[in-house]
């Protein structure tokens, strides 16, 4: 096929020249040829998980919430959980759009980031839907990060990892800048989505396991399914940047990352104590000390760092829940079937 060569200097993309960051040799607008098959697989898996909160019936949750069958301590856990997640998902989405996307120079990785940003919006929608369904004070829930010290501390911690990256003069071309960018990725993928969120999932899914607040529980299952992919993408992205830029992975940077995770563990334990001043549903705040440390070790190992806590997992059932390859179909209880563009009725 004949082609009009508009610019003789521009050539078709060579896969070997693609890079995750600082790649100016290829056109970032050309998806193919795909180099990072893991990024494309994460994108496809994300697309296979399409869902909306409004597809989940909330009648049983509404009935239970309006009754006197839930204790005040159980209500406290639910409200503080919603209070954290309702704005945390927005922080993650904003970080993708404003801090991460522009520094990633690979189109298939960007393709997934666009998908993830959409999912974060769906998750934020979820917490609004829950508030509206239960008749909660939306201002109280969505402003909890300004009113609850344990939530504010976690969000402030996350924002410290975004400030430098949002500076208009920030660049990942230097080792210092790239190291700061990696810390941002660790902060949001490893810590926020891989530690803070998982602790929250345990709390709400514990209700679901006892047939309480099942509508909320089902939505959290969907979110967990999304977040598992987010976490895996983030780990692959961090490891990919390390592999392509080995000079940035210094002992100093590794120590800084370990210190960040240690601080995150402390913050999450304090949050768990705030949520659970007394035990409910077989949960005690002391169990979250072990759990948060356990998953922190797993996250450290996934990015090539040594575990530091060696704690047991007090919630082994979460391993099954997190397994994306399990036979259970999370979407079998949906009110409506998801329709792709190809079969919508006009």
Swiss-Prot record:
Regions crossing the membrane: none
Annotated catalytic residues: 129
GO biological process, one term: deoxyribonucleotide biosynthetic process
Keywords, sorted A to Z: Deoxyribonucleotide synthesis, Iron, Metal-binding, Oxidoreductase
CDD domains listed in its UniProt record: RNRR2
NCBIfam families cross-referenced by the UniProt entry: PRK07209.1 (NF005550), PRK09614.1-5 (NF007186)
Protein name: Ribonucleoside-diphosphate reductase subunit beta
Organism listed in the record: Chlamydia pneumoniae (Chlamydophila pneumoniae)
């Amino acid at each position: 096929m004949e082609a009009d060569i508009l610019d003789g200097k521009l050539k078709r993309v060579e896969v070997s020249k693609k890079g995750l960051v600082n790649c100016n040799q290829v056109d970032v607008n050309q998806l193919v040829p795909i180099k990072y098959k893991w990024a494309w697989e994460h994108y496809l898996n994300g697309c296979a998980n399409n869902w909306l909160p409004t597809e989940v019936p909330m009648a049983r949750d509404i009935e239970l919430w309006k009754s006197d069958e839930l204790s005040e301590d159980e209500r406290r856990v639910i409200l503080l959980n919603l209070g954290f997640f309702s704005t945390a998902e927005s922080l993650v989405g904003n970080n993708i759009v404003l801090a991460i996307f522009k520094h990633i120079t690979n189109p298939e990785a960007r393709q997934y980031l666009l998908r993830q940003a959409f999912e974060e919006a769906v998750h934020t929608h979820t917490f609004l839907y829950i508030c509206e369904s239960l008749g909660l004070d939306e201002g109280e829930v969505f402003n909890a990060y300004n009113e609850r010290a344990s939530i504010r501390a976690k969000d402030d911690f996350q924002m410290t990892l975004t400030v430098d990256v949002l500076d208009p003069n920030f660049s990942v071309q230097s080792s210092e800048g790239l190291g700061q960018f990696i810390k941002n990725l660790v902060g949001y993928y490893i810590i926020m989505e891989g530690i803070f969120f998982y602790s929250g999932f345990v709390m709400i899914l514990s209700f679901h396991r006892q047939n309480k607040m099942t509508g909320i529980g089902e939505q959290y299952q969907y979110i967990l399914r999304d977040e598992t992919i987010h976490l895996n993408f983030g780990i692959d992205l961090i490891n990919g940047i390390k592999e392509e830029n080995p000079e940035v992975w210094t002992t100093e940077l590794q120590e800084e990352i370990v210190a960040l995770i240690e601080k995150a563990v402390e913050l999450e334990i304090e949050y768990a104590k705030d949520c659970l001043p007394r035990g409910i549903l077989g949960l005690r705040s002391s169990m979250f000390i072990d759990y948060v440390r356990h998953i922190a070790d797993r996250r450290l190992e996934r990015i090539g760092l040594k575990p530091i806590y060696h704690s047991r997992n007090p919630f082994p059932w979460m391993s099954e829940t997190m397994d994306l390859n399990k036979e259970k179909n999370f979407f079998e209880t949906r009110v409506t079937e998801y329709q792709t563009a190809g079969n919508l009725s006009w």
